[in-house]
Every structure is written in C-alpha cells, then in structure tokens.
Amino acid sequence: MKRVHVIVEGRVQGVGFRYFVQHEALKRQLTGWVKNNDDGTVEMEVQGNESALQLFLDTIEAGTMFAKVARMHIEPRDVRSDEKQFRIMYGSGF
C-alpha cells in the first residue's frame, strides 16, 4: 500500500480533469481526493496497491483529448487506513 500527493500543472481546469481522475482512481480501487487550486493546478492525494497506483499516475500524466498535463509533482505521504473512497473536493475545505 502506498500514498502520494500530486500537483498537476497544465490545461487541467475546466476540461473535466477531476472527473477523469476520479474515474481512473475508482477503476483501479484507489482511494483519496482531488481538487482544483486557485493557481490553475489540480491537487490530489491517492493511495492503493503500488502497481495500480503507478498505472493510474501514468494514465493521468497522459491526459485526455481536452486535458493536457505539462508537469506532475509527486511526493510520498503516509497511508491513511481510515479512507474508503475517492472523492472530488469542492472549495477550499476538506
């Protein structure tokens, strides 16, 4: 089990990127959250099986027809054993 914090730069807001991220996470049974930041980046924390997580990150980095990822900053985080779902966060609150 592994957890990472990711900041994604590029054309990633207003193009359905958070929904794409959520779909790909759920498809791989990953948990965590994703949200838009005021600076135009998308931020997320994701955890799960290490191979599923790597496949998820590779897929996210490739983007979509509308979302273009320029750069991803990835840092390890402590695993949260209490987390059971992957959700889209709205606003600045958790």
UniProtKB/Swiss-Prot annotation:
Domain Acylphosphatase-like: 3-90
Source organism superkingdom: Bacteria
Presence of the UniProt keyword Hydrolase in the record: yes
Catalytic reactions on record: an acyl phosphate + H2O = a carboxylate + phosphate + H(+)
E.C. code: 3.6.1.7
Catalytic site positions: R18, N36
Broad class of enzyme this protein falls into: hydrolase
GO molecular function per UniProt: acylphosphatase activity
A Pfam family of this chain: Acylphosphatase
Keywords: Hydrolase
Family assignment from sequence similarity: Belongs to the acylphosphatase family.
Record-given protein name: Acylphosphatase
